[in-house]
């Protein structure tokens, strides 16, 4: 095995010299034996650049504590590889494919390198089919696509992770498919909560969790999405199933790339991001696709720094998405959850050919009513409701009911709200909103529409107010 020596350590960046001049290839994994807290551990680093002469620069994928100059480094001759297949189900892995849930050791039958080319054009499939989530506002106004990519955009604390947890819960229970969850640079507490909730709800056996949390070095946060994607690709290609890939949070992937880029001494571009931002995002997103063997449907939470959608990181992710679910702070401030913005959220399948005439007409009418209500806000604020025409008064009352009706109790939030979660089928969603916009339930109090499932639940709730 080819061996080198550490020449310099700056944080997570290692400069390593190979005396014989046989340099490892870019992205090869290097092994370094280190003593951490009195224990011998193998540290893995990944080759990033050849810096001239016989030296390379690598980024460590775990803490560099305990490393010293002159230490021996071994070139493994291949990129980082992670275990794939049924043995991974129900377990938590780190970026290197090691289990971190303190469970029994897994029997690895097959491993795959995390750096792989995207599928060729002739392997791709392009059929369009709506993916039912059971969440009213999404299914009605910004439907997801089977085998498509969806972005959940939102600032801090508007409910991206809760929405992802509900989607995992609904999909496991209603669709029975495999899910792969990539925790990229998010809170360890949330990762722990997700694991416990999955165990309690019984969906863990159909899920693989792959975590690179906030406290880990940038190299681990940058590569953990690729580790999770490699596991998802195996389910798609070898087993031929429809897989769900959840990434929380894709912004942290770009952020980690920015940190690595700065550590490697590259010139920053706009807003301090790495010059290779769109290349890195493209390399990841092009692999998340559907082939003739199976599909990967991906839902990616995208943190929006300072609620600015024009920031280069979220703006770069936009280009790859089929549907966008925008979470709004103004809506969450009203206490409406999920805080999905019905006017800002979009979907590429929002047309009558895919959705059917009835669904499309109802969705557009709901958006028209909400848009008109938004336009009238200034008049209402300055002059009051009395200055509106009779038609507008009816429309505003209906819009307020629709706004409340777009809220929904979640299964994963039962412990916080005490309200049992509701899964609403697409047909029930369309039927319910059709009846609301046609004025059949204008006589019901608007509070009856808050945090319910279908229109039948709202009618039942209204009986309690009358009593």
Curated annotation (Swiss-Prot):
Amino-acid positions noted as binding ATP in the UniProt annotation, renumbered to this chain: 154-161
GO MF term set: ATP binding; ATP hydrolysis activity; proton-transporting ATP synthase activity, rotational mechanism
Keywords for this protein: ATP synthesis, ATP-binding, Cell inner membrane, Cell membrane, CF(1), Hydrogen ion transport, Ion transport, Membrane, Nucleotide-binding, Translocase, Transport
Catalytic activity reported: ATP + H2O + 4 H(+)(in) = ADP + phosphate + 5 H(+)(out)
EC number from the UniProt entry: 7.1.2.2
An annotated GO cellular component: proton-transporting ATP synthase complex
Membrane topology classification: Peripheral membrane protein
Top-level taxon of origin: Bacteria
Keyword Repeat in record: no
Main location: membrane
Top-tier EC class: translocase
Presence of the UniProt keyword Cytoplasm in the record: no
PROSITE patterns listed in its UniProt record: ATPASE_ALPHA_BETA
Subcellular location: Cell inner membrane
Family that this chain belongs to: Belongs to the ATPase alpha/beta chains family.
Subunit structure of this chain's protein: F-type ATPases have 2 components, CF(1) - the catalytic core - and CF(0) - the membrane proton channel. CF(1) has five subunits: alpha(3), beta(3), gamma(1), delta(1), epsilon(1). CF(0) has three main subunits: a(1), b(2) and c(9-12). The alpha and beta chains form an alternating ring which encloses part of the gamma chain. CF(1) is attached to CF(0) by a central stalk formed by the gamma and epsilon chains, while a peripheral stalk is formed by the delta and b chains.
NCBIfam families named among the record's database cross-references: atpD
Primary role: Produces ATP from ADP in the presence of a proton gradient across the membrane. The catalytic sites are hosted primarily by the beta subunits.
Protein name: ATP synthase subunit beta
Lineage: Bacteria, Pseudomonadati, Spirochaetota, Spirochaetia, Leptospirales
């Amino acid at each position: 095995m080819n061996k080198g020596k550490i020449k310099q350590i700056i944080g997570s960046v290692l400069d390593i010299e190979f005396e014989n001049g046989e340099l490892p290839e870019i992205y090869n994994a290097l092994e370094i034996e280190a003593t951490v807290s009195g224990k011998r551990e193998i540290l893995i680093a990944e080759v990033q650049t050849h810096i001239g002469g016989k030296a390379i620069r690598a980024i460590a994928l775990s803490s560099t504590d305990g490393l010293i100059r002159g230490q021996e480094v071994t070139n493994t001759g291949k990129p980082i590889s992670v275990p794939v297949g049924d043995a991974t189900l129900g377990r938590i892995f780190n970026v290197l494919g090691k289990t971190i849930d303190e469970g029994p050791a897994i029997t690895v039958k097959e491993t795959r390198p995390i750096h792989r080319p995207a599928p060729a054009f002739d392997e791709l499939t392009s059929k369009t089919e709506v993916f039912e989530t059971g969440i009213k506002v999404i299914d009605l106004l910004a439907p997801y696509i089977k085998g498509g990519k969806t972005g959940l955009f939102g600032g801090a604390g508007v409910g991206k992770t809760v929405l992802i947890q509900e989607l995992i819960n609904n999909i496991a229970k209603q669709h029975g498919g495999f899910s792969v969850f990539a925790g990229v640079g998010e809170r360890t507490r949330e990762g722990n909560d997700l694991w416990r909730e999955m165990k309690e709800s019984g969906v863990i056996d159909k899920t693989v969790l792959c975590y690179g949390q906030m406290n880990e070095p940038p190299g681990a946060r940058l590569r953990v999405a690729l580790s999770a994607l490699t596991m998802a690709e195996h389910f798609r290609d070898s087993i031929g199933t429809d897989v769900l890939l959840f990434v929380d949070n894709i912004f942290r992937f770009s952020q980690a790339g920015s940190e690595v880029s700065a550590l490697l001494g590259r010139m920053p571009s706009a807003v301090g991001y790495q010059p290779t931002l769109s290349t890195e995002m493209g390399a990841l997103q092009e692999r998340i696709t559907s082939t003739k063997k199976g599909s990967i449907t991906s839902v990616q939470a995208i943190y929006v720094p300072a609620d600015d959608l024009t920031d280069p990181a979220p703006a770069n992710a936009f280009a790859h998405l089929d549907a966008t679910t925008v979470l709004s702070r103004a809506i969450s401030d009203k206490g409406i959850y999920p805080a999905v913005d019905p006017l800002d959220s979009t979907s590429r399948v929002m047309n009558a050919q895919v959705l059917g005439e009835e669904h499309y007409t109802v969705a557009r009418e709901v958006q028209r009513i909400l848009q008109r209500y938004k336009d009238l806000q200034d008049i209402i604020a300055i002059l009051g409701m009395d200055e509106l025409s009779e038609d507008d008064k009816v429309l505003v009352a209906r819009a307020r009911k629709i706004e409340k009706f777009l809220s929904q109790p979640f299964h994963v939030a039962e412990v916080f709200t005490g309200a049992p979660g509701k899964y609403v089928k697409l047909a029930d969603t369309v039927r319910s909103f059709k009846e609301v916009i046609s004025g059949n339930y204008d006589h019901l109090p608007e509070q009856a529409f808050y945090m319910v499932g279908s229109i039948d639940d709202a009618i039942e709730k209204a009986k309690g107010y009358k009593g």
